[in-house]
């Protein structure tokens, strides 16, 4: 293998590894009023260009666990593509229903 081919391969592998690197997600709980918190998943790339707030339709009760998994909504288009938004340099916030609305009917009839 010539030196130029080797260099091209190295550059290609670096580009591939950068493209496959995912922005880690973090679960954040924000106190909103007495005894109530607002949980969200935040994906923050190193230098975000802008921010997007993603909210699932329907009843809105994602039931985000501390590890970032969801009991409902993983199939929702915005929830599925949150990493792609972050990959484009956007800070992403996926918002759950507030802690006092974590059972049926969640946000139905509330918002």
Identify the function of each model-found stretch:
Residues 45-84:
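Short, surface-exposed "cap/lid" segments of acyl-processing enzymes
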Residues 22-47:
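N-terminal cap/lid segment of alpha/beta-hydrolase-fold proteins
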Residues 51, 86-96:
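A fold-wide structural signal in alpha/beta-hydrolase
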Residues 16-19:
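N-terminal signal peptide c-region/cleavage motif recognized by signal peptidases
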Residues 58-61, 98-102:
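Solvent-exposed loop/turn segments at secondary-structure junctions
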Residues 34, 56-59, 89:
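Sec/Tat-exported extracytoplasmic proteins
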Residues 2-12:
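Sec-dependent signal peptide recognition
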Residues 76-77, 81, 87, 99-111:
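Alpha/beta-hydrolase active-site loop
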